[in-house]
């Protein structure tokens, strides 16, 4: 809510880390809980056009953004990825990317929330590339390095990476990509 507020400015921020977790517009939600409200989408759009960098993570970053043309246009034209269905349940315990393979929380447990049905996403531009893939090969992350801005979107919550050292190593690599000019 603070991010969406007109009083909050992204000016001066080198990068935005947008954590969507399990956010999604679902029929059983007690209140609206989209990955992007129109206010957030507009603010991110302006921020990226000014040369910012965005790291987006969440289980439903694709599927929650196919309902309207504005949603689809934002993820495809600005973030440079497109929804490719749900990731197969038999291939999503492991993720490959950044020259490593790691496990994510997929089943309910006492330690951490789990991503039960994450999206699969693919590049929507020939200037974007698959940066992460689930164990079965479906796309789990798309990176884009444009002339004025950069994005890295992953279709699982970053915080669901099981191993702390791997999380730290992954974040270091992600930051290196997003803030390097």
Predicted feature residues:
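Residue-level detector of buried hydrophobic side-chain packing
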Residues: 44, 51-54, 144, 148, ...
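Short, solvent-exposed loop/turn elements at domain surfaces
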Residues: 139-141, 160-165
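An acidic, glycine-rich "communication" segment
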Residues: 56-143, 147
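Short amphipathic alpha-helical segments and helix-helix/interface helices
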Residues: 37-45, 118, 171-175
């Amino acid at each position: 809510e603070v991010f969406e507020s007109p009083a909050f400015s992204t000016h001066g921020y080198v990068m935005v880390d947008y954590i969507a977790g399990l956010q999604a517009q679902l029929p059983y939600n007690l209140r609206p809980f989209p990955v992007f409200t129109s206010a957030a989408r507009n603010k991110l759009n302006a921020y990226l056009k000014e040369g910012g960098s965005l790291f987006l993570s969440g289980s439903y970053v694709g599927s929650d953004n196919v309902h309207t043309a504005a949603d689809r246009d934002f993820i495809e034209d600005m973030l440079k990825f497109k929804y490719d269905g749900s990731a197969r349940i038999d291939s999503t315990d492991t993720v490959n990317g950044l020259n490593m393979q790691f496990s994510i929380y997929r089943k309910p447990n006492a330690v951490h929330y789990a991503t039960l049905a994450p999206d699969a996403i693919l590049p929507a531009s020939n200037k974007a590339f698959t940066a992460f893939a689930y164990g079965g090969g479906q796309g789990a992350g798309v990176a884009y390095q444009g002339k004025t801005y950069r994005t890295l979107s992953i279709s699982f919550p970053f915080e669901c990476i099981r191993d702390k050292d791997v999380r730290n190593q992954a974040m270091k690599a992600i930051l290196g990509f997003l803030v390097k000019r």
